[in-house]
């Protein structure tokens, strides 16, 4: 049993296994194993075929060059992978440090933490929201005043400008339509609008 396990372990560790690996998972040792396998095959060819030794030696130089290039590529990729791992570790350490120091530096009882990935996060300052609400309230008041004014015109409490005839004689105003005392009293809204109309004319 032990001999079977040893044979299986040797098969798993045999240099030819490097040829079956994914190219992106090759290590420098795998390149050396491939070099060993190719070298053994070249020796067999050289022994069996006596007339092709010059062809085998030319082929051997080309194979050595390809293996050197492969070794350089594997070295570079393993170095790049190591650099990436080191960079990842450095970034993790930096994030951990910021998380430890963050609550002490930036957050206080009068500060708010905003999650930038939250789609429902606030997008305006509190003062901007207050300004918008005040402007909305002013516009509502103006709308209500205009609606009251319109209602007064419709009900006849305030006569339309067509009912009034104004003549200027010695700076006196004469009107032709009779009005009651209640209709003579102008509201501040009416005086405001008449003041504005007087400016426009």
Swiss-Prot record:
Residues 14-108 form the RH1 domain. CDD domains: RILP-like (cd14445). Residues 67-155 form a coiled coil. GO terms for molecular function: dynein light intermediate chain binding; protein dimerization activity; small GTPase binding. Keywords: Cell projection, Cilium, Coiled coil, Cytoplasm, Cytoskeleton, Protein transport, Transport. It comes from the Eukaryota. Residues 175-201 are annotated as: Disordered. Residues 121-197 form the RH2 domain. It is found in: Cytoplasm, Cytosol; Cytoplasm, Cytoskeleton, Microtubule organizing center, Centrosome; Cell projection, Cilium. Its main location: cytoplasm. Belongs to the RILPL family. This is RILP-like protein 2. It comes from Xenopus laevis (African clawed frog). The gene is rilpl2.
